[in-house]
Regions:
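Periplasmic/extracellular, small/polar-rich flexible segments of pilin-like filament-forming proteins
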Residues: 67-195
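Membrane-proximal N-terminal amphipathic helix
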Residues: 32, 39-78, 82
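Generic detector of isolated residues embedded in canonical secondary-structure elements
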Residues: 37, 56, 139-142
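N-terminal single-pass transmembrane signal-anchor helix
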Residues: 1-46, 50
């Protein structure tokens, strides 16, 4: 009788804790990268959208609100309400209040109330300004430099710093656009148009 040594098979024990932890770590990294990319795209969309909104407000104001004596309105509240009433506000912007009465207000993506107001120069209301509050720092830099390159804006103010020629470089904007507090932007942009 002979004895044969039979190799004993080790039972399959499945995944170990180390393998499970490694897979979980890879999944977390992938989710983080995807969410970060989505946040960047969302932010860029807001910047492009609000740049277009400012341009649309300027064009609509020039075409719909300029009268024989320029922009002869008593206040920015009245002028903004009338712009909304005549259909000159971008449709993607939020309005609050009574649109048909001309008392509605206009709000940007970041929750700031946008005001279109007459600007008096040499005793005449031949210009107007568009005030954009609560703008985040990155959007402040991008929007001001983008609209500065367009050439239709006579002056740009970032917070309390005025660029009376309407020319704002990335370096200029980067120096005066203030960082956000938490997740809220605190920059106020004012675009002035003569004519």
């Amino acid at each position: 009788m002979s004895f044969h040594a039979v190799a004993r098979k080790q039972p399959h024990r499945g995944w170990g804790i180390l393998e499970s932890g490694g897979v979980a770590l890879v999944v977390i990294v992938v989710i983080t990268v995807v969410l970060g990319g989505l946040y960047m795209l969302w932010n860029r969309k807001n910047i492009a959208l609000e740049s277009a909104n400012v341009q649309s407000i300027i064009t609509s104001t020039q075409g719909l609100l300029k009268g024989r004596n320029g922009y002869n309105y008593t206040s920015g509240t009245v002028m903004t309400g009338l712009l909304i009433q005549v259909g000159g506000a971008p449709k993607n912007m939020m309005t609050k209040g009574n649109v048909t009465a001309g008392t509605a207000t206009l709000w940007n993506t970041w929750g700031g109330q946008v005001i279109v107001a007459p600007v008096i120069a040499n005793g005449f209301n031949h210009g107007f300004s568009v005030s954009y509050p609560k703008v985040p720092q990155d959007a402040c830099i991008a929007i001001t430099t983008r609209l500065s390159a367009g050439g239709s804006i006579s002056g740009i103010s970032i917070n309390s710093t005025a660029f009376s020629d309407g020319n704002v470089t990335v370096e200029n904007a980067g120096a005066v656009c203030v960082k956000d507090t938490g997740r809220s932007g605190i920059n106020t942009l004012t675009f002035t148009v003569n004519g």
